[in-house]
Design a protein with these regions (language model features):
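Extracellular beta-strand/beta-solenoid scaffold signature
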Residues: 129-134, 154-162, 178-186, 207-221, ...
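Extracellular beta-strand-rich, repetitive "passenger/adhesive" scaffolds
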Residues: 120-127, 146, 174, 450-454
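Acidic Gly/Asp/Thr-rich repetitive segments characteristic of extracellular carbohydrate-active
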Residues: 40-94
Length: 479
C-alpha cells in the first residue's frame, strides 16, 4: 500500500514539473478534428482509393537531384535521386527539394508498397519524369502532383504510366503525355482511384512496332474509380475498358464519372467485354461525363459516347467460352455535338441498352464518390483543377486551351509541340526542424516549429499524421 502511495505521489509531482517546464512560447496542439478546414482537406481522395494511406508516417526521403545516375562503385541508385527513394523498403514518403525534369535511364518501377510520392512539395514549377515510364506493381501507393511525359527519344514502346495487379493505389493530379503505347493504363487493380489527371497527346504515328497508336489507356478494376480526369488528343482508347485478355479477376464495378474527353480520332470509349469462361462483361458506371469532339475526330464517330464490345478473339483464345458484353449504367453524359445523345445517352452507343446496359447503378462492392457533379459542372472543374496544377506548365495550359477553344490535333512526336518545357526551381520555405512542414504553417495550426517529431504525430486530424495534413492542406483548393 505504501509503495502505491509513493508511486502516485511521484507521478503527480512529475506531471506538475512537466507542466511548469513548458516554455510559454511553445504552442499547444489543438484538440483533434476541431479545424474544419483541415478535416475537409483530408477528404479529397474519393472512391476506391479513399482509405489508402501510402507511406504516411514512414521514413522521409528527399529528392535533391534531377539525374538518374547510379553509384559507380555499387551500381545502385545515388542517394538524393528519385530512383533511390523509390527503391527503398518500408513505409516511406518521397518529397522534393528541387524542381525540374528527371530524364530517366530506364523505367521507374515501384515494386515495394507503402509509399507516397508528394510532387506538390517541389519548390517552383514542380517535377517532370521523361524518357521512360512509371510502372506500379505494388500495394498501398499514392502518387500525386507529378508530370510523366514519356516522349520518343529513348525509343521505348511504353505507356507513360501503368498500374497493374495492385491493391490500394491512388493517382492524383498527374499530367501524363507523349506515350508510345497507351498514355495511362490501369487494370487488374482493387481499391483504386485515378482522379484529377490530365492524360493527353499520346503519339500516333510513332515508333511502336505495331504501327499507328495514339491511345489514351486501358482502364478497369474492382472498386476502381476514375473521376475528374481529362483525356485529350488520343486517336482511340478514350478509354478502352479492360477485357479478359489482360485480366480475368477484376471485372468491376468501376466508376467512370465526371471525366472530360476531347478530340478523339477514330474511337471514343469502348470495350468492356469478357468471356463466359473468364471474368465476363465488365460492370461499369458511365455517369456525368463530358464528351467534346475536336478537329481530329472522324465524322462517323463524332456523336459516339461508347462502343461496348461483344466480340474478342483474344479473350476466347485465352479463356475459351463465348464473349459477353459489358453491363453499363449509362446516364447524365453530355455530348456537345448532339443534343439527342445528351438527352438519351443510349443513342450515343453502338449497342442497345438491352445488349450492354443495366437500369441500376452498380453499388455493391464500390466505394461511392462523396461529391458528384453534373457533366457541365465537371467540365469546368476538370479544366480548372486537373493535372499537376499547383503550378501548371505550358503543356497543360495549351491542352486546356485546346479543349476550351476546340483547337489542337493528334500528334506523332513531342517535337511538334515544342518538347519538354524548362521547369524552374525556387527557394524552399523555412522549415527549422526539418520535418517537412514550414514553420509558418506549424505556428498557424498550433504545432511546434522546433519539434522534429510532431510531423509524425496525429494531433490535427484523426487518422492522418500532421505532415500528411499539411501536404493535403497545401493543395486544398485544387479539388
Amino acid at each position: 500500500m505504501n509503495r502505491m502511495i509513493v508511486n502516485s505521489a511521484l507521478g503527480l509531482l512529475c506531471a506538475v514539473l512537466m507542466t511548469a517546464c513548458n516554455k510559454p512560447d511553445e504552442p499547444v496542439n489543438p484538440t483533434i478534428d476541431t479545424n474544419p478546414e483541415l478535416v475537409a482537406a483530408c477528404q479529397h481522395i474519393e472512391g476506391g482509393g479513399a482509405n489508402v494511406k501510402g507511406g504516411d508516417g514512414g521514413t522521409i526521403y528527399r529528392v535533391s537531384r534531377l539525374d538518374d545516375e547510379a553509384d559507380p562503385n555499387t551500381g545502385l541508385p545515388m542517394a538524393g535521386t528519385l530512383r533511390y527513394a523509390v527503391n527503398q523498403t518500408g513505409a516511406r514518403r518521397v518529397v522534393f527539394t528541387t524542381s525540374g525534369t528527371i530524364h530517366l535511364q530506364k523505367e521507374l518501377r515501384i515494386k515495394t508498397g507503402s509509399i507516397t510520392i508528394d510532387g506538390q512539395t517541389a519548390p517552383g514549377d514542380g517535377i517532370c519524369i521523361a524518357d521512360y515510364p512509371l510502372v506500379i506493381n505494388a500495394s498501398n501507393v499514392i502518387v500525386r502532383f507529378i508530370r510523366i511525359r514519356l516522349g520518343d527519344v529513348s525509343n521505348t514502346e511504353a505507356d507513360a504510366v501503368s498500374v497493374n495487379n495492385s491493391q490500394g493505389v491512388v493517382l492524383d493530379h498527374l499530367s501524363c503525355s507523349w506515350s508510345v503505347d497507351e498514355c495511362v493504363s490501369c487494370y487488374g487493380n482493387t481499391d483504386f482511384t485515378m482522379q484529377y489527371c490530365i492524360v493527353s497527346e499520346s503519339l500516333k504515328e510513332s515508333i511502336h512496332g505495331k504501327g499507328s497508336h495514339g491511345y489514351g489507356g486501358i482502364w478497369g478494376g474492382t472498386n476502381a474509380s476514375f473521376h475528374h480526369n481529362l483525356l485529350a488528343h488520343h486517336d482511340s482508347r478514350n478509354p478502352r475498358f479492360d477485357h479478359d485478355y489482360v485480366n480475368t479477376s477484376c471485372t468491376g464495378p468501376i466508376d467512370f464519372v465526371n471525366n472530360v474527353v476531347y478530340n478523339w480520332g477514330g474511337n471514343s470509349a469502348y470495350g468492356g467485354e469478357g468471356s463466359t469462361n473468364g471474368g465476363g462483361g465488365r460492370h461499369i458506371n458511365f455517369v456525368n461525363n463530358y464528351f467534346k469532339p475536336g478537329p481530329s475526330t472522324k465524322s462517323s464517330v463524332k456523336e459516339r459516347l461508347v462502343d461496348p464490345w461483344t466480340s474478342c478473339s483474344n479473350c476466347t483464345d485465352r479463356c475459351g467460352g463465348s464473349v459477353t458484353a459489358p453491363k453499363i449504367f449509362l446516364t447524365g453524359n453530355t455530348m456537345t455535338s448532339s443534343a439527342s445523345v445528351t438527352s438519351d445517352n443510349w443513342t450515343g452507343s453502338t449497342k442497345s441498352k438491352s445488349v450492354a446496359g443495366t437500369d441500376s447503378r452498380w453499388t455493391n462492392g464500390l466505394t461511392p464518390l462523396t461529391i458528384e457533379q453534373t457533366a457541365n459542372e465537371a467540365y469546368e472543374t476538370v479544366l480548372t483543377k486537373a493535372g499537376c496544377s499547383l503550378h501548371r506548365d505550358a503543356i497543360d495550359t495549351r491542352i486546356v486551351n485546346d479543349v476550351r477553344n476546340s483547337t489542337g490535333k493528334l500528334i506523332n512526336t513531342q517535337s511538334e509541340v515544342g518538347g519538354w518545357p524548362q521547369l524552374q526551381t525556387a527557394d524552399k520555405t523555412l522549415d527549422s526542424d526539418y520535418d517537412g512542414m514550414p514553420d509558418e504553417w506549424e505556428t498557424q495550426f498550433g504545432l511546434n516549429p522546433k519539434d522534429p517529431m510532431d510531423g509524425k504525430a496525429i494531433t490535427l486530424v484523426t487518422g492522418y499524421t500532421n505532415l500528411e495534413v499539411y501536404l493535403r492542406h497545401l493543395v486544398r483548393n485544387l479539388y
